[in-house]
Amino acid sequence: MSKSDVFHLGLTKNDLQGATLAIVPGDPERVEKIAALMDKPVKLASHREFTSWRAELDGKPVIVCSTGIGGPSTSIAVEELAHVGVRTFLRIGTTGAIQPHINVGDVLVTTGSVRLDGASLHFAPMEFPAVADFACTTALVEAAKSIGATTHIGVTASSDTFYPGQERYDTFSGRVVSRFKGSMEEWQAMGVMNYEMESATLLTMCASQGLRAGMVAGVIVNRTQQEIPNAETMKQTESHAVKIVVEAARRLL
């Protein structure tokens, strides 16, 4: 390869300065915000949906790298970060809750994901569970409690698509294939907390390859009440989730 050690991220092992933990938001615009909460933030690279920064927590290096939306791009980010030395991944995102008792602004820590994606099948058969690492989960729960966040711990439905896979009918065709008709009600009955689009791939990849991963998300809408989040609520919820993931990273270093 050229000057970088990995094809898509444009990073070298030297860029990481020995970092073994990465915080992985989906949105590239969140990367700098997260890095800014730590010491000595420095931008490393930006290619397509992948923006990466390095910073320090208590003198130890941490990488922040966006994954983009969905499993395929997440798998690229995780694969290439692992190649240059990352062994622990903390995903931070926003989400829509599907349980009536979960409020907008609450925080969800995922223990495992319903594998509604396709990318995770490229790493392990469907019988293999998409489970979070216990130490990562514990750190996220403790970090959430430390800032007084109302926290729910449980299972997430992780879909390849935002619309049909999450049983949304407000689309061009208004059509949802039979596989997903009534699926949200089924997940609700099973106690699934929410939908998002990356955790099944992340957790399956890491659990099946000896890597550690955890997942935290801020609730920006409860789909039993409405579909469109409030912009100010989104901003506040994102801020809380970012603080939690940084504090969890500190506990894991």
UniProtKB/Swiss-Prot annotation:
Keywords: Cytoplasm, Glycosyltransferase, Transferase. Its main location: cytoplasm. Transmembrane segments: none annotated. It is found in: Cytoplasm. Pfam families: PNP_UDP_1. The keyword 4Fe-4S does not apply. Disulfide bonds: none annotated. Its EC number is 2.4.2.3. GO terms for cellular component: cytosol. InterPro entries: Nucleoside_phosphorylase_CS (IPR018016), Nucleoside_phosphorylase_d (IPR000845), Nucleoside_phosphorylase_sf (IPR035994), Uridine_phosphorylase (IPR010058). It catalyses: uridine + phosphate = alpha-D-ribose 1-phosphate + uracil. NCBIfam families: PRK11178.1, Uridine-psphlse. PANTHER family: FI09636P-RELATED, URIDINE PHOSPHORYLASE. Homohexamer. Belongs to the PNP/UDP phosphorylase family. This is Uridine phosphorylase. It comes from Klebsiella aerogenes (Enterobacter aerogenes).
